[in-house]
Structure formats: structure tokens, C-alpha cells
Amino acid sequence: MQVYAVGGAIRDELLGKPSQDRDYVVVGATPADMEAAGYKPVGKDFPVFLHPRTKEEYALARTERKTAMGYKGFAFYCEPDVTLDDDLVRRDLTINAMARAVDDDGKLVGPVIDPHGGQRDLAARQFRHVSEAFAEDPVRILRVARFAARFHDFTVAPETVALMRRMVDAGEVDALVPERVWQELARGLMEARPARMFEVLRQCGALARLLPELDRLWGVPQRADYHPEVDTGVHVMMVIDCAAAMGTTLAVRFAALVHDLGKGTTPEHVLPRHLGHETRSVELLEDVCKRLRVPNDCRDLAVVVAREHGNIHRSMEFGAAAITRLLERCDALRKPGRFADALLACEADKRGRKGFESDTYPQKARLLAALDAAASVDAGAIAKALADDVSKIRERVHEARVAAVDARLKQLADH
């Protein structure tokens, strides 16, 4: 049997980028051969084995045949007569359909095996499908979009965009399970330029099917004095790229993505103003989270940011009482980490505008100082002192927090 490293490891080597892991394909072997060599079987859908020493995954070379819609609708053939080229031709993109032989020590040996022009497309910075079999797996649309967020100087070949459009028109993306859609979107959000992912999804029409709430933001105007970029979709893309450049978590980037969804449903006669869009954004993002089964931490932060980002932006004008109410609405005293993340999303929102990319965000330091002051109030001691009149506990705790925040704001003003 012959072992080859395939896919991303070869692509990244040619690009001079580190590769986190390798995919291995074994040609000319049966499952019995693999087990006899000490490999442990782990694959459910097709034969995959763990190396006895490194525990890396090795898959038998295989071909695929489409049997139903969706990404699970495949039958696999994994016999010793399947060649390396048979295996490579089923892969998504030419840049992922290259291989190199691997010796007994796990080292890459020999030339790059490139039957489909992957090196040519790497040089041209282009994503191109290997064959029409690309159309059999709708996850590949999401993967191409995600790769665009990682390799953001690449473009999608026109014929590949056209094929992706045909897949969308045929309803293939509608058959994707929500968990897989979220998984790919989440991975793309964590890349260097997540906006590129959504640009590619729009380009082929997939965004309108997967996230219509986001897709409808393009073409919706905002006030040019606040948003020189005007277009709401453009603004949101600037915000998520800013959040990525800040090195934020997935929850922050998702909150940045969905914070303005309500602007897509603003009545035309009030444009470019968007009064009440915060409430509409919360309703829409909750629908998105339910549909895609978004994790609770991402959903909860997104709700806080969508509902309160306008107040957080205006908080430099707020006194102690208004700031304390804001902290309490955000549950900042019980969840200070989430509140700090909300401030990061709001900072990205402010800087994600044409001409404002390098702005500072003094609201963040002021609100964190206010939170520190409010947290210094001993609510337990107040409750103990009012044990005979518990109805006043919440009011007195709130008053004490306002006083503490007021004192801290005066200190900041003096400095």
C-alpha cells in the first residue's frame, strides 16, 4: 500500500503557510490490511483509521456517488483498486486536490502530484472546482466562502461561481442541516477577513437562502453623517472585519454580524433613519439563532449588543443614574465578562465605518470603570441591614450603586 498526504497540507506548504494537521490517503489497502499494520478503525461512514503511533487519521482512497440531496446523501466505494487520482478528482477545489507521497517515517517525499492544476490556481490566487462532482455536496459552497475569508486575496473562478449559483437554484443549500451551516459560518467568522465569506455567499445567491435577514441589509441606506459608507450591508461587513482585526472571540464577531439586522425592515418612508431598529434586530437575531441552533453564549451576547449598542455609543453623555441602569439592564454585575465583550462589539461597530477605522472608543474605559465602582457596593450588607423591610433592598442597592458610579465618574473627570 502507498500513503499520501493530500489536500490542505500540500496547499499550505506551497503557500509557505503552517498547516495544523495533515490528511492522509492510503491507496491499495483493505481495512484488514490497515488493522494488520496496527491501525485502529474509527470511521463510521467510510474507512478511517488512527495511526498506531501518531494517532493521526488515515483514510482509504475512495470514490463517491450521489444518492440523495444534502451533504449526507452519498455512497462510498473504498476498494484497493481505487487510485490516487480517483480520490483526488472527488475533492472540492483544485488547490485542495494535490498530494505528495509519505515515507515510513511520515516525511513528505517526491514531487507534488497535481493532476488538476492546483499549482496554477494557487499562482493565480483562484478557487476553481475540480469537476462537476462539486455540485453533489452543498457544504462545498460554504467551504469556498470560508476559504475566501482565510485566503482573502483569492477570487472564485467565474465557472465555479456559476456552478454554485446552479446549486443554490436547485435547492441544494436548503437541504443543509442547521448545525453544519452554523459550524461553517462560525469557522469563517474566525478567519482574518470574515466579510469575504459573506461576499462570496451573496455572489452565488446562497446568503439569501441561508441568512435572508442579513442579505436584505445591502442597499439599505443609513444617514451619511453617521455612516459615510451609507450602505448598511457594507457597514456590517466593515464591522465584522474590524472585530476580526481586534482578535475578538466568536461570540463578539457573531454579535457584530447581527447587531443591525433590524435596519433591513425599516419602512422605506423613514429611511435613512432607523428608529427602533434595535428592538427589531433582537427579534430577527433570535429567529436566526433558533433556526441555526446558535450556541447560547453567542445568542445572549448578540441580544445585549443589538438592544443596547445605541445606548453604549451615547454613554459618554450619560450621568451616573443612566449608566447604572445600563449596567443593570446588561446584567453586567453578574456577567462582567459578557459586558466587556459587548463593549468590544460596540467598539467594532463605531470603527466599522468609512473614515472611522482608527478611532478610539472612550466609552469602553468609562463604562468599565463605572462597572468596577458599582461592583464595589456590598449588596449583602445592605440586604442584612434591611432584613425587616426587604421590599426596599433592590432600591437601596441601586441607589448605592448610583452613588458609587457618580463618585468614580467625578474622579475620572478630575483626571
UniProtKB/Swiss-Prot annotation:
An annotated GO BP: RNA repair
Keyword flag tRNA processing: yes
One matching Pfam family: HD
Lineage top rank: taxon: Bacteria
Claim: Magnesium is one of the keywords in the record: yes
InterPro entries tied to this protein: CCA_bact, HD/PDEase_dom, HD_domain, NT_sf, PolA_pol_head_dom, PolyA_RNA-bd, tRNA_CCA-adding_enzyme
Catalytic activity: a tRNA precursor + 2 CTP + ATP = a tRNA with a 3' CCA end + 3 diphosphate; a tRNA with a 3' CCA end + 2 CTP + ATP = a tRNA with a 3' CCACCA end + 3 diphosphate
Molecular function GO terms recorded: ATP binding; CCA tRNA nucleotidyltransferase activity; cyclic-nucleotide phosphodiesterase activity; magnesium ion binding; phosphatase activity; tRNA binding
Cofactor details (free text): Magnesium is required for nucleotidyltransferase activity. Nickel for phosphatase activity.
Residues reported in the UniProt entry to bind CTP: G8, R11, R91, R143, R146
Residues that, per the record, bind ATP: G8, R11, R91, R143, R146
Function: Catalyzes the addition and repair of the essential 3'-terminal CCA sequence in tRNAs without using a nucleic acid template. Adds these three nucleotides in the order of C, C, and A to the tRNA nucleotide-73, using CTP and ATP as substrates and producing inorganic pyrophosphate. tRNA 3'-terminal CCA addition is required both for tRNA processing and repair. Also involved in tRNA surveillance by mediating tandem CCA addition to generate a CCACCA at the 3' terminus of unstable tRNAs. While stable tRNAs receive only 3'-terminal CCA, unstable tRNAs are marked with CCACCA and rapidly degraded.
Domain-level remarks: Comprises two domains: an N-terminal domain containing the nucleotidyltransferase activity and a C-terminal HD domain associated with both phosphodiesterase and phosphatase activities.
Self-association state and partner proteins as the record states: Monomer. Can also form homodimers and oligomers.
Family under the similarity heading: Belongs to the tRNA nucleotidyltransferase/poly(A) polymerase family. Bacterial CCA-adding enzyme type 1 subfamily.
Remarks, miscellaneous: A single active site specifically recognizes both ATP and CTP and is responsible for their addition.
Protein name: Multifunctional CCA protein
The species this protein was found in: Cupriavidus pinatubonensis (strain JMP 134 / LMG 1197) (Cupriavidus necator (strain JMP 134))
Gene: cca
